[in-house]
Regions:
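Penicillin-binding protein/beta-lactamase superfamily catalytic region
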Residues: 205-313, 326-331
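N-terminal leader/targeting segments and the immediately adjacent pre-domain N-terminus
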Residues: 15-80, 85, 103-108, 140, ...
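A small/polar active-site loop signature that marks catalytic segments
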Residues: 140-216
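Bacterial Sec-dependent N-terminal signal peptides
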Residues: 1-21, 355-356, 368
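Active-site SXXK
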Residues: 68, 85-111, 138, 180-184, ...
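C-terminal outer-membrane/trafficking sorting elements
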Residues: 359-434
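Short, gly/Ser/Thr-rich active-site loops of penicillin-recognizing serine hydrolases
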Residues: 330-361
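Active-site helix/loop module of the DD-peptidase/beta-lactamase fold
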Residues: 105-143, 190-222
């Protein structure tokens, strides 16, 4: 019994010790401690290729934090440390945490029906159908509302129509998420910017503001403010010993699979290292991790045009990217671009391998994103194989039997699927047409 008690004490001590190793910058001013890549034993000859890649992909700001301290901080063009940029859907995690704070304060319960806060008739569903939708369904993208109407951002009842029973279908749908703002405003009795500022922003020294250019509510801030929020996520909702989200159960649920349809999605948060994943504007379930060259325990806030917060608890690492679209596809979730960053970042950290390390037997697309020719390689292609290209909705675009260099210059920009069937295997790869 004494040994068990001693073990519990030691584990608790080590857990607290790990938390104490994180550095937190002051709430005001520009002071922020730094570490050099040399101090960490990183391979500095990989930094310039990383920066060259980022600049070529329209990046404006890029930061890497280790143990809360800045290791890499690079701004491109006229963008500087104090420049403001939009988060796009990376801001969804801000709302996800804010809902958890409101619940901890007793203002709402995520298992309550959404109509309690949005009013009856917030959709065009029948009352029975609408009453099945809860706040949790809005957090997990399982509202069952139709995301394929062509008005996925529209929050008017006429735009919110029935597709499936709540909880039975995962679809990346902005409108139900955006309406969480009104849920929070109704529950708190405060303006969304006001409640956000007092609950998160001021407590961690962020700057920024929520603005509504249309139906969407978009957060704008500096890259360092984005890094501050990444640090809050890394420390599980606690800032320098002060709880911001004082609910460890909610945080755990936020950063773990929230349903069994898309294993790689928590509460408005993307997850890595799962057996499968889904992407916006598609009902296809892909096998493997969302970001294959990144650590399995990574979770992320990802936004359109490559707005990225990567958090890696096992390495006490935070990676931030702000900027314009890295290519012409304008994907809602930049998982391919994010993976390309990790390939180069692994070289910088002298860790060129990952759980998805490529070997000669694996089939892989060359030069992804693709311009005119879709080329792929792998030793399993030495025999006969069938190659097919699909769009993300699953529609067949073309077949090319026993041809690993396919002309795709006439395809529209966006994400596609390459399916390769050999005599022994069936492989599906996502790729992006610039």
């Amino acid at each position: 019994m004494k040994k068990i008690v001693l073990a519990i004490i030691v584990i608790g001590y080590l857990t607290n010790l790990q938390g104490q190793t994180l550095y937190f910058p002051p709430l005001t001013g520009n002071e922020w401690q730094k570490l050099t890549p040399e101090e960490l034993g990183w391979c500095t000859d990989g930094i310039e290729p990383l920066y060259t890649f980022l600049e070529g992909k329209n990046t404006k700001a890029f930061l890497v934090l280790k143990d809360g301290k800045i290791v890499l901080e690079k701004y491109f063009g006229t963008f500087v440390q104090d420049s403001i940029w939009y988060w796009a859907s990376a801001g969804k995690t801000l709302t996800g945490m804010l809902v958890g704070i409101a619940q901890k304060e007793g203002l709402l319960d995520i298992y309550e029906k959404s109509s309690k806060y949005l009013g009856e008739g917030w959709t065009s569903l029948s009352k029975d159908q609408e009453d099945l939708i809860t706040i949790r369904h809005q957090l997990t993208m399982t509202s069952g509302l139709d995301d394929g109407t062509g008005e996925a951002d529209c929050t008017l009842p006429s735009c919110l129509i029935y597709k499936a029973e709540a909880g039975t279908r995962w679809a990346y749908h902005n409108a139900p998420y955006t309406l969480l703002d009104k849920v929070i405003e109704t529950a708190s009795g405060k303006n969304y910017n006001t409640y956000f500022a007092q609950s998160i922003k001021n407590k961690i020294g962020m700057n920024g503001i929520w603005l509504k250019p249309d139906y969407n509510n978009v957060y704008y801030s500096t890259a360092r403010s984005m890094a501050r929020y990444g640090l809050l996520l890394l420390n599980k909702g606690v800032w320098n010993g002060n709880p911001v989200l004082n609910d460890s159960v909610y945080f755990k649920n936020m950063t773990n699979s929230s349903q069994n349809i898309n294993q790689s999605y928590g509460y408005l948060t993307w997850l890595n290292g799962k057996d499968s994943y889904m992407l916006p504007q598609s009902q296809i379930v892909f096998g493997g991790s969302t970001i294959k060259d990144a650590p399995d325990d990574l979770f992320a806030a990802l936004g359109k045009n490559g707005q990225i917060i990567n958090v890696v608890p096992s390495k006490n690492l935070i990676v931030i990217r702000m900027g314009n679209p890295p290519n012409q596809s304008g994907l809602f979730v930049p998982n391919v671009f994010n993976n390309d960053i990790w390939k180069l970042l692994n070289d910088v950290m002298c860790n060129s391998t990952s759980s998805a390390e490529v070997n000669e037997n694996q089939i892989r697309v060359l030069n992804n994103p693709v311009r005119d020719r879709l080329s792929f390689t792998g030793s399993t292609l030495e025999g006969y194989f069938e190659a097919s290209v699909y769009d993300v909705s699953g529609k067949l675009i073309l077949n090319a039997n026993h041809n690993n260099d396919i002309y795709v210059g006439n395809l529209a920009s966006g994400m596609y699927l390459l399916t390769i069937r050999t005599q022994t295997d069936l492989k599906t790869i996502t790729w992006v047409k610039e």
